[in-house]
From Swiss-Prot:
The gene is aaeB. Keywords: Cell inner membrane, Cell membrane, Membrane, Transmembrane, Transmembrane helix, Transport. It is a multi-pass membrane protein. The chain crosses the membrane at residues 11-31, 41-61, 67-87, 91-111, 119-139, 150-170, 368-388, 405-425, 429-449, 460-480, 481-501. The lineage of its organism: Bacteria, Pseudomonadati, Pseudomonadota, Gammaproteobacteria, Enterobacterales. One of its GO terms (cellular component) is plasma membrane. It is found in: Cell inner membrane. This is p-hydroxybenzoic acid efflux pump subunit AaeB. GO terms for biological process: carboxylic acid transport. The keyword Metal-binding does not apply. InterPro entries: PHBA_efflux_AaeB/fusaric-R, PHBA_efflux_pump_AaeB. The keyword Plastid does not apply. Belongs to the aromatic acid exporter ArAE (TC 2.A.85) family.
Length: 651
């Protein structure tokens, strides 16, 4: 029952059932174009499977369904507004729709990746409505309502198929990953105190950052499964912070030991070096370490080690609650209430603008070419351009997504022709035969989708789209060929646009991210208690993960970013003297660091960065004048030296 083959076959059957149910109910309820409900069921069920490379979790399917509903409704409302305002000017209507698609793509590039699908869908939904009702604009409201109804029906069928045939809960995977992350955290600390080779440590913390990010991403899917996981969701949110704290403290321990190898006593090092292959054994180790720290002198225990043990203790307490989903205790409530996460602003503003420009320009060119030539395949081509350019932009490799779509529509032509010209006409007298034939196609492609076969998802969606499943069915070969040709040309044009309009914002975005790490470090210099209690770690590590995705082979950037995160944490824990002059200087330093981020050109950025270094030198002198202890002056000096050393990478 748990073998990979059985799981693949089970999902393929789920996909077939969802598509067949949407087809049957679409005809039974007398919907005008059941194709949309069938296509929605296929995309909602198969999309997460292609992304996961296997059977998706129930929460992923429902999350995808909700995003499709939201995107469809936003797109329908946008299309209706454009039609109402410009009904007497068809060309202006089409150009406004292209602008709408570009704006939606721009927004989808700024929001969280898991929610970007809704805005991409909203962009091309409005275009589909306007293109479809171009000759009868007065019927646009009716078409929008019908499309929304068909979309909702397809989503209901996909969710029901998952519920009926053994839904896959994400909870067990969360439990396993929670334990794995804890074990990996302990191993990372052991590597840092040994110390091991830099490459081994880099690999260990890189994997931990990815697993911690993945664990946090599972929360939304868990909440989509059932409301009874609310307590787990709260614990997971704080567990994410504790895991990031453990990574930071372990890496800071490595840096401290590199400069002061004798700071760790032999007894403490021996205790930390003892193996602990299970969470239960780590729990026992933490008990022993807490007792040892309690009876030891405070100066005998490095601050990073005591902080690591404290974070690991909180992690263990939260992990136990996640496994059992029990009521939140008073101690846990104190931990949960003490975390105030800070949301970060996207650093991909320029990248998002390029994405919106690609979609807007590509759809506008397709629309003008359609209006100029009167090409019968122009509408389908224009819609396909919008679909590909909207959905590909937020992926790590948009060009490969466009190629996937192109291969899919090419494969859909012979498969769709076989069904449209031979199989479907032969099953017109029997709904059962029609459902079996379409279900068989879905079953075969459902297996390939889980293998992430290039072109498989595009083949499924494109084949359903060109079959023109309408009520009543009309077998117009010319219409079929126009639709198929429009899809192929649209995907090809989209690929050409992606290749011609290059995104050169990668280096700029990477530099912006690094300068944001600098800003977070200097902003920790504050006497404001509310600001010091803010939790920046999730936002900082989210930006670090983004840096990992953008520059997968540049280990120097990761080390610099991680060192700046460590500097932020160290300065945030430093007791800065309360002084009006120092507080005013803190504001000035933050302002200068912000100007470095928002500088319009390299000359201004270089000027403000030099000013920031000068202000940090002045700040160090003020700390000396006010006789601040070494615990305050040393971290500030370390940060200033780091910025001097790596200024070429930051400007």
């Amino acid at each position: 029952m748990t073998s990979p083959t059985f799981i693949r076959l089970r999902f393929a059957f789920k996909l077939s059932f969802a598509i067949v149910a949407a087809l049957f109910l679409g005809f039974h309820l007398q919907l005008e174009t059941p194709r949309w409900s069938v296509l929605t069921a296929a995309i909602v069920a198969a999309g997460p499977a292609f992304a996961a490379g296997g059977e998706p979790f129930s929460g992923a399917i429902r999350h995808r369904g909700w995003l499709r509903i939201i995107g469809t409704f936003i797109g329908c409302i946008g299309g209706l507004i454009i039609i109402v305002l410009t009904i007497r000017a068809p060309v202006l209507t089409l150009m406004l729709c292209c602008l709408w698609a570009g704006v939606c793509t721009w927004i989808s590039s700024l929001v969280r990746v898991e929610n970007s699908y809704a805005f991409g869908l909203a962009g091309y939904t409005a275009l589909i409505i306007i293109v479809t009702t171009g000759e009868t604009p007065l019927l646009t409201p009716q078409f929008a309502v019908e499309r929304c109804s068909e979309i909702v029906l397809g989503i209901v069928c996909a969710v029901m198929a998952d519920l009926l045939f053994s839904p896959r809960s994400i909870k067990q995977d969360i439990d396993r990953l929670v334990d794995k992350v804890l074990l990996d955290q302990y191993r990372l600390l052991q590597l840092c105190i040994r110390p091991a080779e830099k490459t081994d440590i880099d690999r260990a913390w890189n994997d931990l950052v990815k697993n911690t990010t993945a664990l946090n991403g599972m929360r939304s899917y868990l909440m989509m499964e059932s409301s009874r996981w609310q307590r787990c969701n709260r614990r997971l949110q704080v567990l994410h912070t504790e895991s990031l704290t453990l990574i930071t403290q372990a890496c800071e321990t490595y840096l401290v030991l590199a400069n002061h190898p004798d700071i760790l006593t032999a007894e403490l090092k021996a205790m930390l070096s003892e193996p602990a292959p299970t969470p239960a054994e780590i729990h026992q180790r933490m008990k022993t370490l807490r007792q040892f720290i309690a009876v030891s002198h405070s100066e005998a225990i490095p601050h990073t080690i005591s902080s690591w043990v404290g974070a690991a203790t909180r992690y263990l307490l939260l992990a136990k609650g996640i496994h059992t989903n029990s009521s939140i205790s008073r101690v846990e409530e104190g931990i949960l209430a003490g975390v105030v996460p800070v949301k970060h602003v996207s650093a991909e503003g320029h990248h998002a603008m390029i994405n919106g420009l690609r979609t807007g320009v590509a759809t506008a060119i397709g629309g003008l070419f359609w209006l100029w030539t009167g090409w019968t395949s122009g509408a389908g081509c224009m819609v396909m351009i919008a679909v590909v350019t909207s959905l590909a932009m937020r992926t790590p490799n948009p060009r490969m997504v466009a190629i996937d779509f192109l291969l899919g529509v090419i494969m859909a032509l012979p498969i769709g022709a076989l069904y449209f010209m031979f199989i479907i006409p032969a099953t017109q007298q029997s709904m059962l035969l029609l459902c079996i034939s379409l279900g068989l196609l879905a079953f075969i492609i459902g297996i390939e989708v889980q293998k992430r076969r290039l072109g498989s998802l595009g083949t499924l969606a494109s084949t359903i789209n060109i079959m023109v499943l309408s009520n009543p069915m009309e077998f117009n070969v010319s219409l079929f060929l126009d639709s198929a040709l429009g899809q192929i040309v649209g995907c090809f044009v989209s690929l050409i646009v992606l290749l011609l309009i290059r995104d050169n914002a990668k280096d700029r975005t990477g530099r912006t991210l690094l300068n944001r790490f600098v800003y977070s470090a200097v902003s920790a210099l504050t006497t404001n208690k509310a600001r010091r209690n803010e939790n920046h770690l999730p936002a900082l590590y989210q930006q670090l993960n983004q840096l990992l995705m953008m520059f997968p082979g540049d280990i120097d950037k990761y080390r610099l970013a991680l060192t700046l995160i460590i500097a932020h944490q160290r300065l945030n824990k430093t007791e800065v003297p309360v002084n009006a002059e120092l507080s005013a200087f803190h504001k000035q330093i933050r302002y200068t660091a912000d100007r470095v981020i928002n500088a319009k050109n390299s000359q201004k950025r270089r000027y403000y960065f030099a000013r920031l270094l000068q202000e940090l030198d002045q700040y160090q002198q003020k700390l000396v004048d006010y006789q601040s202890p070494d615990a305050v002056t040393r971290p500030v000096k370390r940060l200033a030296d780091m910025l001097h050393k790596y200024q070429s990478a930051l400007i």
